[in-house]
Design a protein with these regions (language model features):
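DNA-contacting surface of Y-family translesion DNA polymerases
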Residues: 202-279
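Long, highly charged, low-complexity intrinsically disordered interaction regions
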Residues: 130-193
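Intrinsically disordered, low-complexity, Ser/Thr/Glu/Asp/Lys/Arg-enriched terminal regions and linkers
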Residues: 57, 66-79, 96-99, 134, ...
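Residues that scaffold, gate, or flank divalent-cation-dependent active/transport sites
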Residues: 1-113, 117, 241
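Hydrophobic alpha-helical hairpins/lids featuring a short glycine-rich hinge
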Residues: 95, 99-150
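Short hydrophobic beta-strand that contains or immediately precedes a catalytic carboxylate
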Residues: 21-22, 152, 198
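Short acidic, glycine/serine/threonine-rich loops at helix termini
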Residues: 31-33, 55-58, 160-168, 208, ...
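Amphipathic, charged-and-aliphatic alpha-helical interface segments
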Residues: 64, 183-214, 239
């Protein structure tokens, strides 16, 4: 069964499209630095002592990361500067980048405020240029219009384009050609954690229980995956192991939410907390 499914999924491989994934570099932190140049070159994080939304690259050198409690970030980097988030500002700059994206793919898919997927097949064919050339052009336009840098990945589908955009971060690009051998070679040694859709829990199951650490090991243990997981889950694992991913079709775009939270300071007055929560 596993060999048959691999054959069927491989037959679905589409190398006819050129996808571009654009990912802004440390977006929130970069916007804040653009607004306040005194922050340039200093370790800084957007957020507070309870939670960090993002950290600039100076702070990341100390191990400070997004979704990390701020007090831990402060222990890792005592000089860390906190800046409260300003989503109006981030939305403004995000809209500027989207105006650029629309010129290359009117139906681009916005994954969040700071990243987007563009199908640049038509513009490449119409202008007789490569995906890498368009990626460089888009990056230049974004910087020209916003003053912010971004990284880009070019590949035959969205799954691979997203992986590629992370390779030469920050302020770089990586191009994976639309060639089956190139794709299979590229994907085979990828750690499974690099795959969008495989989180920490799934990674732990695959690595610790099944000894699967890379994408080629997914294919080698396909029969085991079909025996242990639902057909849908196993199909997903095999498709990403082949570098197909199931992300290359346009999806209906829905508005994503932006969370906002506040952590209360220590207090002995329980009534005041309930009063605030009742507002």
């Amino acid at each position: 069964m596993a060999d048959r499914k691999i054959y069927e999924l491989e037959a679905m491989r589409d190398l006819s499209r050129i996808w571009l994934h654009v990912d802004m570099d440390a977006f929130y932190a970069s916007v804040e630095t653009l607004s306040n140049e005194s922050l340039k070159g200093k370790p800084m994080a957007v957020g507070g002592m309870s939670m960090i939304s993002t950290a600039n690259y100076e702070a990341r050198k100390y191990g400070v990361r997004a979704a990390m409690p701020g007090f831990i970030g402060k222990k890792l980097c005592p000089e860390l500067i906190f800046v409260p988030p300003d989503f109006k500002k981030y939305t403004y700059y995000s809209d500027l980048t989207r105006k650029v994206f629309q010129e290359y793919d009117f139906d681009f898919v916005a994954a969040s405020l700071d990243e987007a997927y563009l199908d640049i097949t038509d513009v490449c064919n119409e202008r007789g240029v490569s995906g890498g050339q368009i990626a460089e052009e888009v990056r230049g336009r974004v910087f020209e219009d916003t003053g912010l840098t971004c990284s880009a990945g070019v590949a035959p589908n969205r799954l691979l384009a997203k992986i590629c955009s992370d390779i030469n971060k920050p302020n770089g690009k990586f191009v994976l050609t639309n060639d089956q051998l190139a794709v299979v070679t590229f994907v085979s040694s990828l750690p499974i954690r690099k795959i969008s859709g495989i989180g920490k829990v799934t990674e732990s199951i695959l690595k610790d229980a099944l000894g699967i650490k890379t994408c080629d090991q997914i294919i080698n243990k396909a029969a085991l995956l079909y025996a242990l997981f639902s057909p849908c889950s196993a199909d997903f694992f095999i498709s990403v192991g082949l570098g197909i991913g199931g992300m290359n079709s346009l999806e209906t775009r829905t508005r994503k939410s932006i969370s906002h939270e506040r952590t209360f300071s220590p207090t002995n007055y329980e009534a005041s907390l309930f009063k605030y929560l009742g507002k």
